[in-house]
């Protein structure tokens, strides 16, 4: 039997908002190293150094705003719960024998495309929804419960989560590149190039190491999720290693639109247009476009 890592997620409840404070602390420390210690004072030097500082600080602050906007959008947005009294269309068409349907309903993974029922919530489960042990409820198109945002990542906040990864990678890369000269000075033998205090130099060194580590790790995570979006699947669905035909892969363009929306002007902000909310039901996590059985293809694990 495969080891189910998700059953250990209940331990994440104890972390609570501590992780949010840790994220804010890392951002604050990085801000201190980049703005207060290095590129803020460089504005007063004049010449090329000042121009470079203006460019670095402008790019840094823009990415920081987008990062924080995306991050708190994931934190505060309800990922999507099953509406009270929701029932599959099959139950509406066949109003009799409800208890029989419940007894026959699948309680397994997403590979079952029939009626699904959650014994813990005592309610029907829409397609692609899963029960989160941390949140204690079923989440629409659940991807995973993220410790960094202290929230589930589901239908309503998956786009914000992907943008958080995207802007985190860009921001940490910019920070690492901008602090690289200070990192090299840290290991220099002479004292001629050192113009800051040992404490400021140490702060810059630690900030560089933190950001290069986050940039590399987030890059891998971002690439993985781009691959998932391209095939219209989630982390949980990939973990389940389906061998059945996967009907939700409706083409790369449509797959991305079901996450980011059809208006590409909004792809890089954690918002949807009102038009997309109306014409793309997949954004709500209850109704998904699917291909016919003859057109479907197997969903392979990553």
From Swiss-Prot:
Membrane topology: Multi-pass membrane protein
Residues forming the catalytic site: 146 (s-palmitoyl cysteine intermediate)
Membrane spanning residue stretches: 17-37, 56-76, 166-186, 204-224
Enzyme class, spelled out: transferase
Keyword Membrane: yes
Keywords on record: Acyltransferase, Cell membrane, Cytoplasmic vesicle, Lipoprotein, Membrane, Palmitate, Transferase, Transmembrane, Transmembrane helix
EC annotation from Swiss-Prot or TrEMBL: 2.3.1.225
Pfam families: DHHC
Reactions catalysed: L-cysteinyl-[protein] + hexadecanoyl-CoA = S-hexadecanoyl-L-cysteinyl-[protein] + CoA
Record bears the keyword Secreted: no
Any Gene Ontology CC annotation: plasma membrane
Function: Palmitoyl acyltransferase.
Protein family (similarity comment): Belongs to the DHHC palmitoyltransferase family.
Domain notes per entry: The DHHC domain is required for palmitoyltransferase activity.
Name this protein carries in UniProt: Probable protein S-acyltransferase 13
Species of provenance: Arabidopsis thaliana
């Amino acid at each position: 039997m495969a080891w189910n890592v998700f059953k250990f997620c209940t331990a994440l409840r104890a972390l609570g908002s501590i992780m949010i404070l840790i994220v804010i602390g890392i951002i604050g420390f990085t801000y201190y190293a980049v703005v207060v210690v290095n590129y803020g004072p460089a504005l007063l030097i004049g010449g090329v150094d000042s121009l470079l500082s203006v460019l670095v600080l402008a790019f840094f602050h823009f990415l920081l705003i987008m990062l924080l906007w995306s991050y708190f959008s994931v934190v505060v947005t309800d990922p999507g719960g099953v509406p009270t009294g929701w029932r599959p269309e099959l139950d509406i068409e066949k109003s009799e024998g409800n208890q029989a349907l419940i007894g026959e309903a699948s309680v397994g993974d997403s590979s079952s495309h029939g009626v699904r029922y959650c014994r813990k919530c005592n309610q029907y489960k829409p397609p692609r929804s899963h029960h989160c042990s941390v949140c204690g409820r079923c989440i629409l198109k659940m991807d995973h419960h993220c410790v960094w945002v202290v929230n589930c990542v589901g239908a309503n906040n998956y786009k914000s989560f992907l943008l958080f990864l995207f802007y985190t990678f860009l921001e940490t890369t910019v920070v690492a590149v901008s602090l690289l000269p200070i990192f090299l000075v840290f290991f220099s033998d002479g004292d001629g190039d050192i113009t800051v205090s040992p404490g400021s130099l140490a702060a810059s060194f630690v900030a560089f190491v933190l950001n290069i580590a986050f940039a590399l790790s987030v890059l891998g995570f971002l690439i993985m999720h781009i691959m998932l979006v391209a095939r219209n699947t989630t982390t949980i669905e990939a973990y389940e290693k389906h061998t059945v035909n996967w009907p939700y892969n409706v083409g790369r363009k449509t797959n991305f639109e079901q996450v980011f929306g059809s208006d590409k002007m909004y792809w890089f902000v954690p918002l949807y247009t009102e038009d997309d909310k109306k014409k793309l039901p997949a954004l709500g996590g209850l109704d998904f476009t699917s291909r016919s059985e003859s057109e479907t293809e197997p969903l392979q694990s990553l």
